Amino acid sequence: TPSLEKMEELSKFISTFGYIIKGDKEEVHPKALQGIIEKIKGKKEEGAISTIMLRSLKQAKYSPECSGHFGLAAKFYCHFTSPIRRYPDLQIHRIIKESLNNKISGKRQEQLTTIVDYASVQSSEKERKAELAERDVHDFYKALYMKDKVGQEFEGVVSSVTSFGIFVELDNTIEGLIRLANMNDDYYIYDESSYSVLGERTKKSYKIGDLVKIKVESVNVDFKEIDFEIVEKIEE
C-alpha cells in the first residue's frame, strides 16, 4: 500500500487538474486510483498524472509474509510464475510439490521458514542490482546513439522536474537533462508541490507532461549523460 505522504502528494498534484482520490488516504484502494486512470485517459494531463501516480507506489519486494497485492487488489497473493522463471517462483514450486506429497513435517516447516526468509531478502536485493545494471547498460547505449546528434532538434515530453533541471523524454524513449543553471532567459524557481519550475521574471513555466522542442547540447558517453537545451515550449 502506498504511504500516506505519497498519497497526499499525489492528491495535491491531481487536484490542480480537478481530480480527487476517493476514500481514506491512509488506506487508499486500488480502485480509487484506477478510477483516476480511467478519467484521464486520452486527456493532455494523462502522461503527467500517470507518471506521478507510478512514482507514488512502493517498489515491490519479495516477502515471506502474505501481505496481498496492491495493484491487483488481492488480499492473498503468491509469486508463483512469470514469463521468465525467477528464483522465488522455483522456491514456491518446490514447497507446493513437497506439500502435495505430504512431506512437510514440523521440522521441515521450520527449515522452509528459514529458507524462505533468506530467499526473500536475497531475491529482492539481487533484483534491485539487476535492474540497476540493466539501466546502466541502457543509459550507455542511449548516450552512444545520441553522440552524433549534437546540435539536432527533437520534440519531447517533460518527464521529470527537479531542483536542478528538467528531464525531457523523446519519442524514442531517450531522456536528456536541461539544466536550470544553463537556462539564460530567466531565473527558474522549482515548485516541489506541482513538479514544475517557474520563471521569476517571465512567469514562463515547465511541468511534467509539457510538450517541448529541444536541441541536443552535449553528450558524454563515459558518464552516460545527455544534455539538452530548450528551444521552445509547444503549446497545444
Name every feature range the model reports, one short phrase each:
Residues 1-171, 177-184, 188-195, 210, ...:
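Append "with occasional cross-activation on large, charged helical scaffolds in nucleic-acid assemblies
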Residues 195-204:
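A conserved acidic, glycine/proline-rich C-terminal tail/linker
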Residues 204-236:
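OB-fold/S1-family single-stranded nucleic acid-binding modules
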